[in-house]
């Protein structure tokens, strides 16, 4: 009955396996380090167009930057003197994988811990400076972070210096348990002693500043500045919505929202922070 077989609707083509992979060899590869995708506007940006400040040319989004990059943008060239580098992070709870995570963070960032501390000059104004780096385990606050910031305030009291801190953190470091949480009280006590000495303390909130850092020294500055659109809060958005059973505003926990509600004194563009810091330090007695 082959004479009455229905004809196929489509022509059968046998694939040529020898052609497999030949196309991919002709497609040019673009190195990942050449471009960055803006988290806000989703545009692909040639990294050189971001500039030293790493600001999106399309929507002005502030990319997260390292402590070293922040240092370059802020202080007078060659003026930074790093302090407290000998303090080593321990693993008191023998938390699984913690030592490996610490080692990887050190290799990736070039830092000893999540905060860079020292003395520096900003437009000839001498300050005690701390810069938190979210690339180091999300700048979570462990015992060493708390100790370095506490010692910075104590040094500032001895040398009659204003303190400037760039905050960025995911909160307390869970791998260190209650010892991490105790840093909130320890640093806050140091802030109070510095304030009692009549010295100026300036905080700059950067993206993200959350958890125990927000609940302690980040919000204790005499003046609190923030970079545009920085995420600032204590608990996460979903946790709050689940707890209160309400939908939160779209801009909730953004720096602009906090300014509107009196928690932030001013939103300052990254490119203008250096001038603003120098002006505020000089206005409040200066650090000479």
From Swiss-Prot:
Q: How is the cofactor bound?
A: Binds 1 zinc ion per subunit.
Going by the record, the broad EC class of this enzyme is: transferase
Top-level lineage group: Bacteria
PROSITE patterns referenced in this protein's UniProt entry, alphabetically: COA_CT_NTER
GO annotation (BP), single: malonyl-CoA biosynthetic process
EC number(s) given by UniProt: 2.1.3.15
Protein name (Swiss-Prot/TrEMBL): Acetyl-coenzyme A carboxylase carboxyl transferase subunit beta
Q: What is the lineage of its organism?
A: Bacteria, Bacillati, Bacillota, Bacilli, Lactobacillales
> Gene behind this chain?
accD
């Amino acid at each position: 009955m082959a004479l009455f077989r229905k004809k196929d609707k489509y022509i059968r083509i046998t694939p040529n396996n020898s052609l497999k992979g030949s196309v991919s060899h002709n497609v040019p590869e673009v190195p990942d380090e050449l471009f960055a995708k803006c988290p806000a506007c989703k545009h692909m940006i040639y990294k050189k167009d971001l500039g030293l400040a790493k600001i999106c040319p399309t929507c002005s989004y502030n990319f997260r930057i390292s402590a070293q990059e922040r240092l370059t943008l802020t202080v007078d060239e060659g003026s930074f003197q790093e302090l407290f580098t000998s303090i080593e992070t321990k693993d008191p709870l023998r938390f699984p994988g913690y030592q490996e995570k610490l080692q990887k963070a050190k290799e990736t960032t070039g830092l000893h811990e999540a905060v860079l501390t020292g003395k520096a000059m900003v437009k000839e104004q001498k300050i005690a400076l701390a810069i938190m780096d979210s690339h180091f385990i999300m700048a979570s606050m462990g015992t060493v972070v708390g100790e370095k910031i506490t010692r910075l305030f104590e040094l500032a009291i001895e040398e009659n210096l204003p303190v400037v801190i760039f905050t960025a953190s995911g909160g307390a470091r869970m791998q260190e348990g209650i010892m991490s949480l105790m840093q909130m009280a320890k640093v806050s006590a140091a802030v109070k002693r510095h304030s009692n000495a009549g010295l100026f303390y300036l905080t700059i909130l950067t993206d993200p500043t959350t958890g125990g850092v927000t609940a302690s020294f980040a919000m204790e500055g005499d003046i609190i500045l923030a970079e545009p659109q920085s995420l600032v809060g204590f608990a996460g958005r979903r946790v709050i919505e689940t707890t209160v059973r309400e939908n939160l505003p779209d801009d909730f926990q953004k720096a602009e929202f906090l300014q509107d509600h009196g928690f932030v004194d001013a939103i300052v563009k990254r490119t203008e922070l250096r001038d603003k810091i120098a002006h505020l330090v000089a206005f409040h007695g200066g650090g000479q």
